[in-house]
Amino acid sequence: MHLLIAAAGSGSRMGADRNKLLLKVAGKTVLEWTLKAAFEAKTISWIGIIGQPKDKNPICSILDNSVKAVQWINGGSTRQQSVQLGLAALPNDAKSVLIHDGARCLVRSFVFDEISKIVSKGQSVIAASQVTDTIKKVDIDGEIIESPPRSDLWAAQTPQGFPVNKLKHAHSEAISKGWNVTDDASLFERLGLPVKIYDAGPSNIKVTTPFDLVIAESLLSTLKD
């Protein structure tokens, strides 16, 4: 299985002066924890890291002792553009691909493997967690419009897995129609293509804020070598 890791995030919401993936948590950088799970996943054979040129040296220094093939890919100005560039850099024989946020450093290796198994059958699937809070839809004035049933709501996560040809087609359609989305599954939704859910649990968070770092520190401390 081929894996693309989106690693172009800034540290603005974290209040950091560097890419948040280079911040330390429980003794390793955020990216190192993400890569640890990817390296341990039995199904992952090739990894591409999509990042900004300014981060290439510090990120590549982390890869010195990689146990799997890892390729650096220059990213774009948005996540969507970065994934497009990542897809263009895939080996010609890539049939399926997983897209993963580098900031989801609590992902477990078995999540990569389970999603890989589903994608290998030609299906599209995303990691997700069922919503436990009551969600409110509000109008422009902040007044509640409705409360969708929690049983219908899932918080999208990564990895997200797709057949390469279908994902490339979806991104091509996005370019031609001017679609801007925050995850790849949204493109499939717009095209009416089916995407399944894999329950990865609530711990597979994306480290975005200082509070997320506290949670990650607590959970990852139990996994230290």
Swiss-Prot record:
Pfam families per UniProt: IspD
Site keyed Positions MEP for the nucleophilic attack: positions: 150, 206
Name the UniProt record assigns to this protein: 2-C-methyl-D-erythritol 4-phosphate cytidylyltransferase
Enzyme Commission no: 2.7.7.60
Gene: ispD
Pathway annotation from the record: Isoprenoid biosynthesis; isopentenyl diphosphate biosynthesis via DXP pathway; isopentenyl diphosphate from 1-deoxy-D-xylulose 5-phosphate: step 2/6
Chain positions of site Transition state stabilizer: 13, 20
Family: Belongs to the IspD/TarI cytidylyltransferase family. IspD subfamily.
Enzyme class: transferase
